[in-house]
């Protein structure tokens, strides 16, 4: 079954967490900065999780820039929004750089037996401060082109790609971590602008996963996208033809609170079409779901376990020391150039 992705409180797995991880509805864990003191400790933490449930999907938000959970012992990945400016607007060069950044990010996580980074961000940079330089560009075609190459780099390391935040978070000012963003634009406006990177990458079959936004598009549907069967089924599945895994964003965020407590949020997300739901930073919420929620009896139609890292491909990628080292230097150069602009 395995519909839930939970987190861990610290540097080791507690007795309570060990019991929770053994629950059949837990299909994955998401790691945060608090779980990583250094690379060796992180590897031991992952090993301990694997000893409990070897098949769990282990994920992290490791996009680059300000959203990079692991730093000690890891290369600092530049913000995606710095790549094109650092290339002085040369899209061909920026695409090459984006591919190497995707490879670098993925290969270093896979070296620690971490399956997945929730990346890339496909939001088009607009007025959202929480997105900002997490986005590749303010131009949809540039987002599509750079994200496509970033994904190729990820795939060459052995990692699947999860695009976020569908259908686009860049055109709302509010931060869904602490508020409920409302986007009043029409369906035609959203489709012509924000949705273009998703449409392009789904059309080229390069997205294995999608994470929807906790944003209400008030002139289109009353529910936030992550709780909307219109957005997830009618648009994402049927209109765009997406056949991968739909992850909810964190059900602990303010943008999810409209659905009530965690039981209500989980039901709303699953009913809308999410295949795996995330609950972060709330062990009480996780416990409530594992003990009180009426989970679906059937397996998810699109199982998140299909996104586990390709270990054989990762091993080959890890042998590419020259590429890895060149990518590390490139990442530093991009950040240095961007800071000088």
From Swiss-Prot:
Major location category of this protein: cytoplasm
Broad enzyme group: hydrolase
The keyword Endoplasmic reticulum is assigned to this record: no
Residues noted as binding substrate in the record, renumbered to the chain: 61, 69, 134, 164-165
Keyword field contains Transit peptide: no
One Pfam family linked to the record: Glyco_hydro_3
Entry's localization field: Cytoplasm
Molecular function terms, GO-annotated: beta-N-acetylhexosaminidase activity
Gene3D superfamilies listed in its UniProt record: Glycoside hydrolase, family 3, N-terminal domain (3.20.20.300)
Protein function: Plays a role in peptidoglycan recycling by cleaving the terminal beta-1,4-linked N-acetylglucosamine (GlcNAc) from peptide-linked peptidoglycan fragments, giving rise to free GlcNAc, anhydro-N-acetylmuramic acid and anhydro-N-acetylmuramic acid-linked peptides.
Protein family membership: Belongs to the glycosyl hydrolase 3 family. NagZ subfamily.
Identification of the protein by name: Beta-hexosaminidase
Species: Shewanella frigidimarina (strain NCIMB 400)
Gene name per UniProt: nagZ
């Amino acid at each position: 079954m395995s519909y839930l992705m939970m987190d861990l409180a610290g540097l080791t797995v507690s007795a309570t967490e060990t019991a929770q991880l053994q629950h059949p509805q837990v299909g994955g864990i998401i790691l945060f900065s608090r779980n990583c003191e250094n690379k060796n400790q992180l590897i031991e933490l992952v090993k301990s999780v694997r000893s409990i449930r070897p098949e769990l999907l282990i994920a992290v938000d490791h996009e680059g820039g300000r959203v990079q959970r692991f730093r000690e012992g890891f290369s600092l990945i530049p913000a995606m929004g710095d790549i094109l400016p650092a290339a002085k607007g040369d899209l061909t060069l920026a695409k090459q750089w984006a591919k190497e950044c995707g490879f670098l990010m993925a290969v270093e996580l896979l070296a620690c037996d971490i399956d997945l980074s929730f990346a890339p961000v496909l939001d088009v940079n607009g007025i959202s401060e929480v997105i900002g330089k997490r986005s590749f560009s303010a131009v949809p075609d540039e987002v599509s082109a750079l994200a496509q190459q970033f994904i190729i780099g990820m795939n060459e390391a052995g990692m699947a790609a999860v695009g976020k935040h569908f259908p686009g978070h860049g055109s709302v000012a509010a931060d869904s971590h602490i508020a409920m963003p409302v986007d009043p634009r029409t369906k035609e406006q959203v489709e012509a602008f924000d949705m273009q990177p998703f449409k392009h990458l789904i059309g080229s079959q390069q997205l294995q996963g999608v994470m929807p936004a906790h944003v209400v598009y008030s002139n289109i549907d009353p529910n936030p996208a992550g709780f909307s069967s219109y957005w997830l089924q009618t648009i994402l599945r049927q209109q765009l033809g997406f056949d991968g895994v739909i992850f909810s964003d964190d059900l602990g965020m303010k943008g999810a609170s409209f659905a009530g407590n965690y039981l209500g949020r989980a039901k709303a997300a699953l009913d809308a079409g999410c295949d795996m739901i995330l609950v972060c930073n709330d062990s009480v919420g996780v416990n409530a779901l594992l003990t009180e929620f009426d989970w679906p009896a059937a397996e998810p139609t699109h199982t998140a376990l299909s996104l586990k890292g390709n270990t054989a491909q990762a091993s080959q990628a890890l042998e590419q020391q020259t590429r890895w080292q060149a990518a590390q230097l490139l990442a530093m150069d991009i950040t240095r150039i961007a800071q000088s602009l």
